[in-house]
């Protein structure tokens, strides 16, 4: 018999917003394909959407040459 799968815990969506007075600021980037309700995961060199698989690579901000 196969082992039973555990219950997945949902993420706490309130951690993705910052409220100051009457303004709300999103702390994570939203997916351009899925819309404003789906946030993208931030990795070392890219942003990824877990719902549709959209990838956006970060730009290298290294403009100076290392000596």
Swiss-Prot record:
A zinc finger (C4-type) spans 31-52. The keyword Ribosomal protein applies. InterPro entries: Ribosomal_eS31, Ribosomal_eS31_arc, Ribosomal_zn-bd. Binds 1 zinc ion per subunit. Zn(2+) binds at residues 31, 34, 49, 52. GO terms for biological process: translation. One of its GO terms (molecular function) is structural constituent of ribosome. Keywords: Metal-binding, Ribonucleoprotein, Ribosomal protein, Zinc, Zinc-finger. Its cofactor is Zn(2+). GO terms for cellular component: ribonucleoprotein complex; ribosome. HAMAP family: Ribosomal_eS31. Part of the 30S ribosomal subunit. Belongs to the eukaryotic ribosomal protein eS31 family. This is Small ribosomal subunit protein eS31.
């Amino acid at each position: 018999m196969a082992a039973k799968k555990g219950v997945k815990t949902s993420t706490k969506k309130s951690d993705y917003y910052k409220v100051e007075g009457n303004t709300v600021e999103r702390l994570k980037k939203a997916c351009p394909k899925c819309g404003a309700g789906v946030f993208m995961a931030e990795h070392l060199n890219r942003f990824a959407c877990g719902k549709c698989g959209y990838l956006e690579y970060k730009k290298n901000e290294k403009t100076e040459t290392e000596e």
